[in-house]
Every structure is written in C-alpha cells, then in structure tokens.
C-alpha cells in the first residue's frame, strides 16, 4: 500500500497509533495521501503525549520531534500542571480538530445516568485487603527511599494490581495461598440482577478474567442466561454472542472483558451497565458504557461503577477527575499512569 497514492487516508479509532514507535504507527506514516483524517472518540486516553503521533500523522513535524514535544508540552502539562503550556498546545491543535460530542450529533438520545455504587467490604475481605496494603506500603515506600520512584514503578504497579484484585475478590489473586471467594461486589451484582433489574438487560465489564469467571459461575448458579467474550474469543464467536444478546429476549447479561469490548460494539439491547473494577482511565470506561448509549437506543441508561469504600478504587476517583479535565482542556497504559505518580501520590494511594 505504501507504493500507492490515495486521495484520502482515514484512520478510524486513531488512538491506535498513539505510540510513535509502534509498528502500526510506523506503517500508517508510510501511507501516501493528498488528504488525511483521524477519527477517534478518545484521542487522548492516558496523557498529553497520546495526541502527538496522531497529529504527526496528519501534519508531520508540526509538533516537532518526540523529544521536543515531551520537554515542551508533555512534562510541563502532565507532571507540572503548567496552565500556560496547556493553553499553548490547545491553540496549536485548535485549527485541526473538529470536536463533536454525542449530545451535539444525537440530540434525541435518551438520558444516561452514571452512578458510583459504593460497596462495603465484609470483615474477611477487609482483613485480607489491609494485610496486603500494609505489606505493599512498607515495601514500596522503602523501595522509593532506597532507589527513587522511577526504579520503584514495577513494585508500585504490582501493589496497585493486587489491591484492585482483592477489591473484586481475593480468590482471583494468583498466589500460592488460595483465598476464599469473599466478594461484596459479586454479592451486590447478583442481588441487583436477581431483584432490582430482573426485567432488564445488562452489560458487565471487568478487566480481570478471574473476576469474569467468578461472575459466570454465579450467573449459572442463579440460572441467569448470559453470553460472554474476552480477548481470546474468535471474531465469528464474538459476532454470534452479539447477535444472541441483541435478539434473544431470554439472554439478560453480556459479560465482557473491558479491553476486548471497549470499542466497535453496538449493544443497544442493554439499558444497564456495570463496571466491576473502575480504574484510572475514565475514557476507557466511558467507551464501554457507550456500547449501549448510542444511536438506536430508546431506553434510559443506568451505568454503575462498583467501588469498594475506603480502598485503592475509592482514592483513584479523584485522579480520574484530573484526567477528564486534561482531555477537555486540550481537545475543546497502566505504566503511563504510574510514571506520573509522585511520592505523595503513592503515600496517599496506599494509606
């Protein structure tokens, strides 16, 4: 394809080229075209740097080299929070961005309510959580003291992941010691599916395959018909699951891996959405919720983010708000998240 000259090259879901050094980004840059267009619902997912490769595809060199952009914009905006740098970048990008929100292009869409559903861990689950939190807090702060925060990123990531898994259920921890399935979230989800929304269809998203497996077992125990897919599901099986959920009244629940089901799906048969393990990237969760809140939907949508009170999930909500503000101001992967944490952030998250 690189030998052909096109009139137009259009990249749909252009956030796929946000990494300038990835193979897909380098391949896209080889395409020859008189006109180029990027389309994305989430051009900025993790940090300011996400927009660099997309803009470099559209207007090569406009934002300078990778290192120039990092020093002039990425570091000052993401790490130092400098408003003048953010405003300067916004002005540069403004002539090349046409932003249309769903509210502007689909004004007849029904109402969508997003609700944080706080769950209080029972004593058994809380005791396991606190034991791991104390252990990782001491390990990580000791590592930061001895090696600095940059060299402690792997330990931070591991600690965050373990605490998140315990918030779902300690049973999904990949440890030598096996823990029972203490899960207040699973109990609450089962109660809602059985009692509160027995006449409705729901999408249930989780980032953890272990949690999805626990939910599958619970649905089978309750006799609730469901369909399922994750990243390993073949394209034909995925399409079959979608059609069954959309067309068969008896199938009430669609279980989906968050990474596998965040984009490219139209699931308007559902009017309830559950994000089992919300995390730091609100854009990913928003895309998941919007699998059902889209053109063709006739019912009001209720989206629940399930959060364990007084946990790592609870604390991360405040960091999410910062990321939403960043995307809004400029556009008017876990590792990237950890790179932006300060020692004070780490102490807060593990406190």
Task: Locate predicted features.
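ASCE P-loop NTPase motor core, strongest for the SF2 helicase catalytic module
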Residues: 1-81, 90-351
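Long, charge-dense, solvent-exposed interaction surfaces that engage phosphate-rich ligands
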Residues: 86-88
């Amino acid at each position: 394809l690189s030998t052909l000259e096109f009139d137009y090259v259009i990249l749909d879901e252009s956030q796929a080229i946000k990494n300038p050094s990835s193979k897909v980004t380098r391949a896209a840059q080889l395409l020859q075209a008189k006109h180029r267009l990027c389309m994305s619902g989430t051009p900025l997912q993790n940090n300011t740097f996400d927009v660099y490769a997309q803009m470099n595809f559209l207007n090569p060199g406009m934002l300078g080299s990778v290192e120039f952009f990092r020093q002039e914009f990425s570091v000052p905006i993401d790490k130092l929070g400098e408003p003048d740098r953010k405003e300067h970048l916004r002005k540069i990008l403004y002539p090349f961005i046409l932003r249309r929100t769903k509210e502007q292009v689909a004004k007849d869409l029904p109402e969508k309510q997003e609700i944080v559903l706080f769950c209080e861990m029972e004593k058994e689950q809380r005791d396991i959580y606190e034991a791991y939190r104390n252990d990782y807090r001491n390990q990580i702060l000791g590592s930061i003291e001895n090696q600095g925060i940059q060299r402690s990123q792997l330990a931070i990531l591991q600690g965050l992941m373990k605490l998140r898994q315990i918030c779902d259920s300690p049973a999904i921890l990949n440890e030598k010691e096996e823990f029972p399935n203490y899960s207040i979230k699973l109990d609450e989800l089962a109660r809602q599916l059985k009692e509160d929304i027995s006449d409705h269809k729901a999408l249930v998203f989780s980032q953890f395959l272990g949690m999805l497996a626990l939910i599958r077992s619970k649905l089978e125990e309750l006799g609730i018909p469901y369909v399922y897919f994750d990243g390993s599901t073949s394209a034909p099986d995925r399409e079959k699951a979608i059609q069954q959920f959309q067309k068969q009244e008896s199938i009430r629940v669609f279980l989906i891996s968050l990474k596998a089901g965040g984009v490219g799906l139209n699931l308007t048969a559902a009017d309830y959405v559950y994000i089992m393990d919300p995390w730091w990237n609100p854009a990913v969760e928003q895309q998941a919720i919007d699998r059902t809140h889209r053109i063709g939907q006739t019912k009001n949508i209720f989206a629940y983010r399930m959060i364990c009170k007084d946990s790592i999930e609870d604390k991360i909500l405040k960091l999410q708000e910062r990321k939403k503000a960043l995307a809004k101001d400029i556009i008017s992967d876990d590792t990237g998240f950890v790179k932006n944490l300060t020692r004070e952030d780490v102490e807060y998250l593990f406190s």
